[in-house]
Amino acid sequence: MTEATKEDVTAAQLLTAPVGHDGARKGMDVDILDVEELRDWQRRKRSEFEEALKRNRLDVRQWLRYAAFEYEQRDMRRARSVFERALAVAPGDVVVWLRYVDCELRARDVNHARNLLVRATALLPRVDKLWYKYVLMEESLGQVELVRGVYTKWCTLEPAAAAWDAFVDFETRQGQVEHVREVYSRYVMVHPVAATWLKWVAFERKHGDAGTVRRVYSLACDTLTAFAGADVHEVEQLVVSFAEWEATQQELERSRAVLSVAVSRWPESSTLKDATAQLEKKFGGARAGESILFKRKREYEEQLLAHPLDYDAWWLYLDLLEESFPAELRAALAEATVKAVPRSQEKDMQWRKYVNLWLRYLLFLETVLVDSDLTRSMYQKLVREVIPNTKFTFAKAWIMYAEFEIRQEKLDKARKILGMSLGMCPKPKLFQYYIDLEIKLKEFDRVRRLHEKLLEFQPDVLSNWIEYAELEENLGDEDRARGIYEIGLTADGGLSQARQLQLMQRYIQFETDASEFERARALYSRYVALSGYDPNVWISCALYESSVPTAAQVASYAHDQPNSDGDDSDDAYEQEFELTEENKEQTRAIFEKALRHYTSEKDDEGRILVLQAYKDYESIHGSAEARQKIASRQPRKVTRKRTVDGIEKEYVAYEFPDDTVSTSSVASKFVSLAQRWKQQQAP
């Protein structure tokens, strides 16, 4: 075989050669050989950019691409011109300003960049990005005084705390301690909160001495307490920090004095009292700490003896015992469940707090004592004897009881507990927990029964119907899902008309997601009737036809993809669907049907809404002839007169060109019939 024979190419090879070549076709490289070709190529590119901007001059990204092109051609004059034109279109676009500045900096034209930042910050003084860009540029150039001036000008606008922090960091890097103090003196006036003062304190701790730190703390306390409406939490945070710092300086008397003055001013503050106790516990010796704890314990006991229904005091008392007297905690918990029984017969905040005391007791029995039998018996007492289930209940108690049994690996008991709760005192929260539990266990038959019970309990709640239908949809049983939707839409379903309309919307979405477009179209017809022929529903129905494939398109896809997997059909429709003339004609047919309905019902308002929607649709998808035709059918306002109670009044009415055309056609038909009859009667 010769070399020529080896290189012969057959027709079969030519046909099969493209197969297997994946990937997009690479763009063609343009070889520019001389300056004239370069100028011609640049002229074509500029024409392309200009044409694109003529079509949409508000496309900021196109402006930026245009400017980047000019910069790449080393034509800064044209690049600046493009940027300036872009700013004329979108002067408030921060990205354009930043790209413009970056372009000038890359071109090493610092003065132009500086002038741009001056313009930008003057036009958009509240945009922090521009200020940060300004100071970063000047600092990178070593212009310390200019940076300080920019920060000073920026801070006159009272920006957010981050800007002040950046100013402080800059002065700290320069080693200008006094300048930092001046910045902080203005910073705390603009943002007079504890966090700002504590930043100043942290600075003085590092760069100052004990005297400067103490002066800042004192000034902070005086400033915050001078305001009548000062936030107590802010003051507490500052005072506690002041006292802790004094203690670290071994100034215990000063620390006690700070806390004492604060407690005398805010005697109800538990934070200040706790800080005082912690100080004494840490620096006052073991005896002092114990005396404080015993004193607090005695005060709580006296308070609870006088007011046994003070549940907040019970909670604080139990916290104290848990932390410092753990041996007494069990007895106190049991005592709380006995002495603190609410007197009211209604579910109020007292009952909620009392049940929370019970639940704390039960968690103690389970986790600390690890006595499952006692815990179980106390749970039974709570849900059967303590809580008046005939009047109200607490779903949290039942759920925690069931979770306890699950932790004990007693799933059957947990189910019985939840079933008992639904039988004695059904609540949506209990149903939802039980349903979620069975879903996790994949017991879907039980889930179905629970959903049915929930619908019997609350048939008027829309979410119950939707969640049940979505369960069947997720399980792949579309027929059961349809049955649930259909029952919900019946009069026996229990839903109001407004909720039936919402359920119908979800039903249509379900059929659409399942690619059952014909079913969805039939549902839309029912939806229109159910809504009382609402114009918005008519419009939605019409536009739906332009968003889904027609029957012919579905059949064509099924023919082209006979072995396609059903699970991917929705994605395939979304990828392959294209709006065709058939879609448009179906949409127009529904618009026309709606117009005929409102014309026969003499509903001008509905007719106007449909005509306007029809016009909007044609403006997007219609031809020039279609747009002109629908525009000619729009109603005109006319002023007419009528007599009411003997008084002539003017009112605004609408004239529809369609009515005039139909009247003229009827009249012409009548005349033609009369002429024909006359001819027939002639001898």
From Swiss-Prot:
General function of this protein: Involved in pre-mRNA splicing and cell cycle progression. Required for the spliceosome assembly and initiation of the DNA replication.
Family affiliation: Belongs to the crooked-neck family.
GO cellular component terms, semicolon-separated: chromatin; post-mRNA release spliceosomal complex; Prp19 complex; U2-type catalytic step 1 spliceosome; U2-type catalytic step 2 spliceosome; U2-type post-mRNA release spliceosomal complex; U2-type prespliceosome
One Gene Ontology MF term: chromatin binding
HAT repeats: from-to residues: 40-72, 74-106, 108-140, 142-173, 175-206, 291-323, 336-367, 374-407, 409-440, 442-474, 476-513, 515-547, 582-620
PANTHER family: CROOKED NECK-LIKE PROTEIN 1 (PTHR11246:SF3), PRE-MRNA SPLICING FACTOR (PTHR11246)
Gene Ontology BP term (one): mRNA splicing, via spliceosome
InterPro entries listed in its UniProt record: HAT, HAT_Syf1-like_N, Syf1-like, TPR-like_helical_dom_sf, TPR_rpt
Subunit and interaction comment: Associated with the spliceosome.
Keywords recorded for this protein, A-Z: mRNA processing, mRNA splicing, Nucleus, Repeat, Spliceosome
Source organism: Eremothecium gossypii (strain ATCC 10895 / CBS 109.51 / FGSC 9923 / NRRL Y-1056)
Subcellular location: Nucleus
Protein's recorded name: Pre-mRNA-splicing factor CLF1
Pfam family membership, one: HAT_Syf1_CNRKL1_N
